[in-house]
Swiss-Prot record:
It holds the Pfam family Metallophos. This is Bis(5'-nucleosyl)-tetraphosphatase, symmetrical. HAMAP family: ApaH. GO terms for biological process: RNA decapping. Its EC number is 3.6.1.41. InterPro entries: ApaH, Calcineurin-like_PHP_ApaH, Metallo-depent_PP-like. It comes from Salmonella typhimurium (strain LT2 / SGSC1412 / ATCC 700720).
């Protein structure tokens, strides 16, 4: 009964299946955690969604920014870009079923027994766990409602970038979405910086990676996240697990077996190209 945490798949279906075969994943007894960004850039987004959906209760996932962008394309709000390789998914006969399932997935996973939290980009140091749970539910409720296209149309933007319990309406939902799915750097007070994508050693002062700023969640829980492929899984404090290692850019798909903290990797089938940059709202 093992728990396997895997970083951003980004449509790399063949590598996902090979990695699961490598660790001998058994859906009847094991649990798979996925850090989000299931789709886009790799050639197999349709197969990834079909497979992950088929796992039922054996999988725990969170939505990433690319998953939200896919939903915006599906809703007719955003443009389908060829580089995202989403057309086979959008034109599939079961597209409606898959994407209506996807929009009902969470932004946050918490296992109290393991003291483990997972979100696509991480947890802002401005939140305690109760606030994070409440904020996740706010966005999840809108995404699972009939008014979800209205939210998706309004989610794009970098402001507000500072948390306040007084935030309301679309401003509140946009901050929550950015914190869970786009965050990398923060100012020392926890305010989000949505612009810098430099490596941590080259980040302009006073910015710090979100995980370098102590917060209530990181002090009490381990945190698993994806999103930040250029970290290559390195440079995080103890108990913080960066799992996106750039499979869709030619890197690797990384798996962490939680029980013994052993890592497994599956090399990408693509040539290394970390210079492509990350897609919309990355």
């Amino acid at each position: 009964m093992a728990t396997y945490l895997i970083g951003d798949v980004h449509g790399c279906y063949d590598e996902l299946i090979a990695l699961l075969q490598q660790v001998e994943f058994t859906p009847d007894t094991d649990t798979l955690w996925l850090t989000g960004d299931l789709v886009a850039r790799g050639p197999g987004s349709l197969d990834v969604l079909r497979y992950v959906k088929s796992l039922g209760n054996s999988v725990r996932l969170v939505l990433g920014n690319h998953d939200l962008h896919l939903l915006a394309v599906f809703a007719g709000i955003s443009r389908n870009k060829p580089k995202d390789r989403l057309t086979p998914l959008l034109e599939a006969p079961d597209a409606d079923e898959l994407l209506n399932w996807l929009r009902r997935q969470p932004l946050l996973q918490v296992d109290e027994e393991k003291k483990l939290v997972m979100a696509h980009a991480g947890i802002t140091p401005q939140w305690d766990l109760q606030t994070a749970k409440e904020c996740a539910r706010d966005v999840e409720a809108v995404l699972s409602s009939d008014s979800y296209p209205f939210f998706l149309d309004a989610m794009y933007g970098d402001m507000p970038n500072n948390w306040s319990p007084e935030l309301s309406g679309l401003a509140r939902l946009r901050f929550i979405t950015n914190a869970f799915t786009r965050m990398r750097y923060c100012f020392p007070n926890g305010q989000l910086d949505m612009y810098s994508k430099a490596s941590p050693e080259n980040a302009p002062a006073p910015l710090k990676p979100w995980f370098a700023i102590p917060g209530p969640v990181s002090e009490a829980y381990s945190i698993a996240f994806g999103h930040w492929a250029s970290l290559e899984g390195k440079g995080t404090p103890e108990g913080i697990y960066a799992l996106d290692t750039g499979c869709c850019w030619g890197g690797e798909l990384t798996c962490l077996r939680w029980e013994d903290k052993q890592y497994f990797v599956q090399p990408s089938n693509r040539q290394m190209d970390m210079g492509e940059g990350e897609a919309v709202n990355a």
